[in-house]
Each structure stands twice: as structure tokens, then as C-alpha cells.
């Protein structure tokens, strides 16, 4: 519920309150071919060689872990040409195998987001992969930015939500969700990885990607930690949030789509529908005052997770952000779900 307090006809304060959030029911809109749609995408991805290329960054590798710049191939954008995605990969120098955290990134609004590079002495005893999905972050900076020129022609530069809007088979998030799966493929191909102990986290768009990874990753993730996740329950999202509703409405007008057609298209990418395929443990952070990914849109997928163990952390004063201790919260959760590895 949104509460507005006025005095003398002026707004004094407005804020959100809530109760019994696990009782929130979002109207079902999963299409009958939802699973087939994603199975087809995964089959197409499997036919694309990973072709991983790792470049050691010696300048960043002075401590306990080597830091690599990594490039790999993913599913095409509808033109038949594989897309290159990039990231940073941190691996302990010491012999042995290690658990993994894959971090998915938020929306690269305006091409201004910071690019996270794991620290050579950070997160001891863990492998980390921070991946930039198609068109965003590393892929949206020189010398790679020219690869992305075609994204902007559909609406606005750096507005990936609009790319091939209305066509589920070539839409941006079909490819981007497959990039998430490809990041798991890459991790599983690396010799120092404990394949029994792969975890994924991400905030905002990255939260949606973490949900997609658990839903579409063929059970290879031990647990996920999505925070303030994007892409949840579009019919209600567009009633309570200004963006991406504004982009969707602009594309709807441009393409002359009625509401039923638009929401059917978006249902294939809605985290509330992907959540029905998630069975691994989940911990999720939610900002009660979030105007970008409002709490309702976070609980839409949360309440549909099929996981036997799931937890939510509502941060009552947070907007589109997570509290300072969120990293330690989800890492503790991941450590609780480490499986014993037989050597």
C-alpha cells in the first residue's frame, strides 16, 4: 500500500507499507508453450560453441587470485551471428577446486554503470565471475561499443528493454537470459570449479537474471540471491512503476499493439513465470520504498518459487538499493548450502 500524508493541501510524506506479502497473488499469464519456448532457446544456445577466451590481467593479479578478462560466445540476436559477451573471472592461484559465485549486473542505464572487477585478494577461497550480458557494461564501452549500434535504432540508445519489443523470438531478453545460461556453461567448463557448488546473485536486472539462471540453468545452481529484482508481473508493474512502463507504452504505440498482445509477449520474460521453474534455495532482498522495482513486483516471483527453502529480507527504508550488509547476508546463505566435495 502507498500512503500519502498531506497537510494544508501539501504533501508532507509518502511511503509504502505492507503486510502478509506471501499472500500476494499475481494473475497467472504463463502461456501454454512457455516451457517449449525456453527449451528451444536452450537448444539453439547449445549449438553455439562457447569459444571462451581468457586473458590474464597481470596488473590485477598480484594477490591470491588471478584475474582474467574473459570473452565467450552466446546465442544470436536474430541475425544468425553469435553475440560476444564479456566479463571478469577470478580464480585462486593455489591448487584445488573452489565454489563459485556468478554475479549478474543491473541495467546499464546511460552507459554509466560501474564495471565491477573482482579483487585479487577478495572473497578468499572462492571463484568469481562477473558477467556483462549482451550490449551492456563492458560490451557497451570502447573498444566494443560499435558492436551495439543496432540496439538503439528501436527506440533510444542504451534502452535494451525496447530491442525487438513485441517479437518474442528475437527480443533482447531472450538472448540476455541465454547469456545467463552461457555464464553457467562457462563456469562448468573450468577445471578449478566445484560443479556441485555454483551460486548466483544480482540486483535489479541482475536479480531477474539470477532467477532466470535458476529457472533455465538445468539445476546447476545450488542457491540464488536476487535483490530488488526487475521484470516481475508486468501487468501490475506497469500500474505502479513509471519505467519500463514508459518504454513499453512507447513501443506499444509504435507497433500498434493492444494490451492483451503486449502482455502475452512479455509473459515469456516475466520472472513470476520463470519462478515456477525454480527449485533451489533462494534468499531475496526487497526495498519497501523501491519506486523502480516496487515490492509487489518482487513478491510476484518470490511467491511462485517452488523451492523448499526460501527467505526474503524486506528493508523498510530502502528504495532501489540494498543495505550495506546484504553481501555478507547472501554469502553466509551460500556458505550454508555448500555441498561436500569428494576428491
Predicted segments — roles?
Residues 7-36:
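Short beta-strand elements
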Residues 32-35, 44-96:
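N-terminal cap/lid segment of alpha/beta-hydrolase-fold proteins
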Residues 86-91, 96-108, 128:
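Short beta-strand element of the alpha/beta-hydrolase
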Residues 107-178, 236-245:
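Cap/lid segment of the alpha/beta-hydrolase catalytic domain
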Residues 140-144, 207-258, 314, 325:
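Hydrolase active-site cap/lid region
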Residues 193-204:
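Alpha/beta-hydrolase fold nucleophile elbow
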Residues 234, 292, 299-343:
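C-terminal catalytic histidine-bearing segment of alpha/beta-hydrolase fold enzymes
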Residues 277-286, 290:
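Short beta-strand/loop motif that positions the catalytic acidic residue
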Amino acid at each position: 500500500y502507498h500512503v500519502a500524508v498531506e497537510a494544508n493541501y501539501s504533501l508532507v510524506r509518502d511511503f509504502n507499507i505492507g503486510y502478509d506479502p506471501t499472500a500476494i497473488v499475481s494473475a497467472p499469464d504463463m502461456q501454454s508453450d512457455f516451457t517449449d519456448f525456453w527449451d528451444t532457446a536452450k537448444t539453439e544456445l547449445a549449438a553455439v560453441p562457447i569459444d571462451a577466451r581468457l586473458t590474464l590481467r597481470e596488473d590485477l593479479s598480484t594477490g591470491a587470485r588471478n584475474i582474467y578478462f574473459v570473452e565467450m560466445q552466446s546465442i544470436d540476436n536474430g541475425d544468425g551471428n553469435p553475440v560476444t559477451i564479456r566479463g571478469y573471472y577470478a580464480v585462486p592461484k593455489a591448487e584445488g577446486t573452489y565454489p563459485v559465485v556468478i554475479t549478474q549486473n543491473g541495467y546499464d542505464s546511460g552507459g554509466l554503470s560501474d564495471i565491477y572487477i573482482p579483487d585479487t585478494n577478495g572473497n578468499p577461497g572462492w571463484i568469481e565471475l562477473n558477467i556483462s550480458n549482451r550490449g551492456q557494461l563492458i560490451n557497451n564501452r570502447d573498444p566494443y561499443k560499435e558492436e551495439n549500434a543496432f540496439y538503439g535504432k528501436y527506440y533510444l540508445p542504451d534502452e535494451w528493454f525496447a530491442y525487438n519489443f513485441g517479437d518474442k523470438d528475437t527480443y533482447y531478453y531472450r538472448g540476455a537470459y541465454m547469456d545467463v545460461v552461457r555464464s553457467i556453461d562457462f563456469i562448468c567448463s573450468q577445471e578449478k570449479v566445484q560443479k556441485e557448488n555454483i551460486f548466483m546473485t544480482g540486483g535489479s536486472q541482475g536479480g531477474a537474471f539470477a532467477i532466470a539462471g535458476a529457472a533455465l540453468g538445468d539445476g546447476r545452481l545450488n542457491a540464488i540471491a536476487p535483490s530488488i529484482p526487475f521484470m516481475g508481473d508486468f501487468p501490475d508493474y506497469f500500474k505502479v512503476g513509471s519505467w519500463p512502463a514508459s518504454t513499453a507504452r512507447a513501443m506499444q504505440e509504435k507497433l500498434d499493439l493492444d494490451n492483451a498482445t503486449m502482455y502475452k509477449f512479455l509473459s515469456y520474460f516475466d520472472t513470476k513465470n520463470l519462478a515456477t521453474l525454480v527449485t533451489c534455495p533462494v534468499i531475496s532482498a526487497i526495498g519497501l520504498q523501491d519506486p523502480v522495482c516496487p515490492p509487489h513486483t518482487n513478491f510476484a516471483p518470490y511467491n511462485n518459487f517452488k523451492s523448499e527453502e526460501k527467505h526474503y529480507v524486506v528493508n523498510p527504508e530502502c528504495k532501489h538499493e540494498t543495505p550495506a550488509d546484504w553481501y555478507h547476508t547472501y554469502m553466509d546463505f551460500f556458505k550454508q548450502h555448500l555441498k561436500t566435495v569428494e576428491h
